[in-house]
Amino acid sequence: MKEAFKEALARFASGVTVVAARLGEEERGMTATAFMSLSLEPPLVALAVSERAKLLPVLEGAGAFTVSLLREGQEAVSEHFAGRPKEGIALEEGRVKGALAVLRCRLHALYPGGDHRIVVGLVEEVELGEEGPPLVYFQRGYRRLVWPS
């Protein structure tokens, strides 16, 4: 069942984000594809964070986090925050430079979700970057969107 479940989810395309939080001098970030818009009024987003993620206690303690929506070409950024470090990649003021958009959120709620926590954030600020194609993850790899001509 576990392998079939993973294979089924690999067939679902999703955008790629980097979620980050800072508590004192400690700043953590992680790549997340389990992210969604939850509500427009109030503006809420939700994401799933593993119980084992180093980000989780920082996010909980800070009571705030950012979500950077990655653009096509930011594969190395995604890999870096997925635990495969790349030289020269870092957060800038809690966000990924060059992202399509950055959402600055206050922690609204936390819910249990199996081996994950469901994190709900109240969006307090939106930074829009340059428009462009998003970074997409599908079938265990990064893909490009094809625009109709």
Curated annotation (Swiss-Prot):
One GO molecular-function annotation for this sequence?
FMN binding
Which Pfam family, any one of them, does this sequence belong to? Flavin_Reduct
List the NCBIfam families: HpaC_Thermus
Instruction: Quote the pathway field.
Output: Aromatic compound metabolism; 4-hydroxyphenylacetate degradation; pyruvate and succinate semialdehyde from 4-hydroxyphenylacetate: step 1/7
The source's superkingdom equals Bacteria
Entry function: Catalyzes the reduction of free flavins (FMN, FAD and riboflavin) by NADH. Subsequently, the reduced flavins diffuse to the large HpaB component. It utilizes NADH, but not NADPH as an electron donor, and both FAD and FMN as electron acceptors.
EC number(s) of the enzyme? 1.5.1.36
Source organism per UniProt: Thermus thermophilus (strain ATCC 27634 / DSM 579 / HB8)
The entry assigns this protein to a family as follows: Belongs to the non-flavoprotein flavin reductase family. HpaC subfamily.
Q: Which reaction does it catalyse?
A: a reduced flavin + NAD(+) = an oxidized flavin + NADH + 2 H(+)
Q: Where does NAD(+) bind?
A: S37, H116, Y137, F138, Q139, R140
Name the InterPro entries for this protein: Flavin_Rdtase-like_dom, NADH-dep_flavin_reductase, NFP_flavin_reductase, Split_barrel_FMN-bd
Quaternary structure (record)? Homodimer. 4-HPA 3-monooxygenase consists of a reductase component HpaC and an oxygenase component HpaB.
Q: Name one GO biological process term.
A: pyrimidine nucleobase catabolic process
Which protein is depicted? 4-hydroxyphenylacetate 3-monooxygenase, reductase component
Binding-site positions, FAD: E27, R28, G29, M30, T31, A32, T33, A34, A48, V49, S50, K54, L55, H80
| Keyword list, A-Z | Aromatic hydrocarbons catabolism, FAD, Flavoprotein, FMN, NAD, Oxidoreductase
